[in-house]
Amino acid sequence: MDFVNFVMALSPILVVLVGILGFKQSAKRVSPIALVWTLILAFTYFNVTGASFADNVKTLDPLVWKGIKEGLKIVLMVFGAFTILNLLRETGAIDDVKSTIARISDDRRVQLIVIGMMLPIFLEGAAGAGAPAAIAAPFLVALGFDPVTSIAVALLGDATPASWGGAGLTTINGGAALVDAGLSTVSLNAAMVGRFHMFGVLIIPFIMVGMVFGKKGFKGAVPYLCFAGVSTCVVMFFLSNFVGAEVTSMGTGLISMLLSLAYVKLVGVRTPEEFRHHAAAQQRKYSAFRAMSPYIYMLVLLPLVRYGFPAVVPNGFAVMCTFGYIFWVDVVILVCGMLGAATLGVSAKQYRAVCSRTVGNVLPVLITMGSLLIVSCIMQSPTTGMMNLLASDIAAVVGRFYPAAAVLIGSSGAFITGTGLGSNIMFAQMHIDAAASLGMNPITIFAGQNAGASLGNLICPNNTVAACATVDAIGRENEVMKHTLRAFAIVLALYMVLAMLYTCVLFPNYGM
């Protein structure tokens, strides 16, 4: 391992982290600096082939445009989600949303777990592509939670199901290298990563409550939190090990929400007054359905389009992904916003005014997202080899602790790419080679990579910026990342221990 090369490859990440967390600057200011620095490295230090300036421009130009195009798609999703929140505020339906949820449970901690953890798990399976945080964070804000902690909770809620993604794509496509090599199957890959995340969802309810309410938040809520964690854990284990990757995330989220609400109704939660949600004592303007209609439409249309369109249209999934996977999710969210506006009785003029105001709020996000995604594309590019250098150097140093390192490598890949799928595809072959040279099980090692990649979404700057934009918290990314980094460290340590136990002690011959 060449330490200088390692630090130089790591430096774009350090610029982002030090700028946001160390100097407490907004991502909007830090990301262009990181982009300029990464471009300088690509033209000089990591110009390993000695290409001329003109040739380098030709190589990097497609990467720059790719980053801008992907940034536009994410901003479109942010626009759709933020428009819905602004519609609810404009019409006053937001107060009726609060009172509707309060009628199910007036305990803010129950609301936090159901909307912050279980709903994102469902949405990840229904759509993925950033939809969970983009929908759950505004929903929590609508219920009266602080925007910063709402974002952190929504991102944490999506830290486990991203290993399956929309219809299991992250595991199915991400683990294709193992399947093609005859080392594993989709079922084995899905089952083993489920054995990581079942412990993640077991502790996440406690992390969420501690993050939002502190130690006092556990008063009277421990039995419910135990039930929420254990029930989600059991459902996730069963679906991932005995049903399949395609339904694990959506099924876990839906069943867990139903079980949680049944517990609240049948057993109840002891709610101190300070954690009781007090609905405004005023006459309802809208029925529960009308007030929550944009979110109800999303819960129905996202899975309906994802599973229904490919079922009835030849090559339907390919058609959906003509402009990239995330684009169909953008369109569905925009349509749900329009349907919600019609259901709420919003005039065309009023709807246009809300959209115009929202455009002004989210447009600056394009600079941030575009810059960070261009950095990501350049670091992933074989031309610079920066990401592969980081991963291979980590692998070379750790030796027999490679299973734990695989979790860290997976997280690093997702931190850069913004997706677990991108991280899995990037590093799967490297893990196969490392497992062969070390005489270890490639299935458990890849499961650690897959689990780490899902967890890495929690701290990815791209995801943080996008989520901040949905609740008008642009510029507060450093506050969000302080919360998410602490949660990330706890779950990362757990997964690294599990990776060592599974590979070296419990399942050394799993699937072999």
Where are these regions (language model features)?
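Alpha-helical transmembrane segments of multi-pass membrane proteins
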Residues: 109-121, 147-163, 185-205, 400-415, ...
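Hydrophobic alpha-helical transmembrane segments of multi-pass integral membrane proteins
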Residues: 107-138, 142, 159, 366-382, ...
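Structural signature of hydrophobic alpha-helical transmembrane segments
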Residues: 1-11, 71-74, 129-132, 187-203, ...
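Hydrophobic mid-bilayer segments of alpha-helices in multi-pass membrane transport proteins
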Residues: 8-17, 25-50, 75-81, 225, ...
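Interfacial loop-to-helix junctions that mark the boundaries of transmembrane helices
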Residues: 1-6, 24-30, 60-72, 187-195, ...
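Juxtamembrane and boundary regions of transmembrane helices in multi-pass small-molecule transporters
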Residues: 24, 163-277, 451-512
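Core transmembrane alpha-helical segments of multi-pass membrane transporters/permeases
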Residues: 58-95, 114-121, 287-308, 321-385, ...
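Membrane-interfacial loop-to-helix junctions in multi-pass transporters
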Residues: 69-74, 101-115, 143-149, 326-329, ...
